Design a protein with these regions (language model features):
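Aromatic/histidine-rich interaction motifs
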Residues: 7, 11
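Conserved S-adenosyl-L-methionine
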Residues: 12-130, 145-146, 150-152
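Residues immediately flanking
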Residues: 126, 141, 178
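Conserved Class I SAM-dependent methyltransferase catalytic core
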Residues: 90, 96-105, 145-216
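Non-catalytic substrate-recognition/targeting regions of SAM-dependent transferases
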Residues: 1-5
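Short SAM/SAH-binding signature in class I
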Residues: 134-140
């Protein structure tokens, strides 16, 4: 999509991240968190969806140099996409990762994607994670080649389950290739969906909680 110049090991595909944002019902006023943000793809794609930023809006295409395609058509369509951006959207995205290099990458990628003012990324351990009120958590916990150690992946899923159940948000959507994720997480998902991250077969585990409301 033109914004991810650098990425961490085994990043999630941008198109898959956008699909997860759709499944997570991200809206213009959503608050999205990711405790394992890596290079920031899930949070960035959620921000672009909330703001109605067209994919590839900030990149250039080889077809723009084709003689038989009038230049004004490209300019017209690009301006149309810009006019449809929801500048008044109240979206906020927050990502966390234990790796400072990944956090620096995520912040740089958000700026390249045009959502640097709507997203922020911080260095933090998953044990410190707290879901904010009415937040939607979209995450891709480390597994397989991202981690290399199945026992460590299980430990991270267990920790995520503990902090989630202590501070549940509006919804949690976790994509992983770990077939025993629910067992490690400590709770059966409300829904599951089979999905692929590139050639890696995964499951998207979906957990729902009722949004907190102010008392009248």
């Amino acid at each position: 999509r033109g914004y991810r110049k650098n990425a961490t090991l085994a990043p999630i595909k941008e198109t898959l991240a956008a699909a997860i944002a759709d499944l997570g019902r991200v809206r213009r006023d959503s608050l999205v968190q990711d405790p394992f943000c890596g290079s920031g793809t899930l949070v960035i794609e959620a921000a672009q969806k909330a703001l109605n930023l067209a994919p590839g809006l900030r990149r250039r295409f080889a077809a723009e140099h084709f003689d038989f395609v009038p230049a004004d058509i490209w300019a017209e369509q690009r301006q149309k996409a810009l006019d449809e951006v929801r500048k008044d959207a109240a979206f906020e995205g927050i990502g966390y990762d234990i790796d400072p290099a990944a956090v620096a990458l995520a912040n740089a990628n958000a700026k390249l994607a045009g959502v640097g003012d709507r997203c922020r990324f911080e260095v933090a351990d998953v044990r410190e994670f707290r879901a904010l009120d009415n937040a939607t958590v979209l995450t891709n916990p480390p597994y397989g080649e991202r981690l290399g150690d199945a026992s460590e992946a299980a430990s991270l899923a267990r920790t995520l389950g503990q902090v989630w159940q202590a501070h549940p948000a509006q919804g949690l959507y976790a994509i992983t290739a770990d077939a025993e994720f629910e067992q490690h997480f400590g709770k059966k998902a409300a829904r599951r969906r089979k999905i692929y991250n590139g050639m890696i077969p995964c499951q998207l585990y979906m957990y729902f909680e009722q949004p907190k409301r102010e008392r009248k």
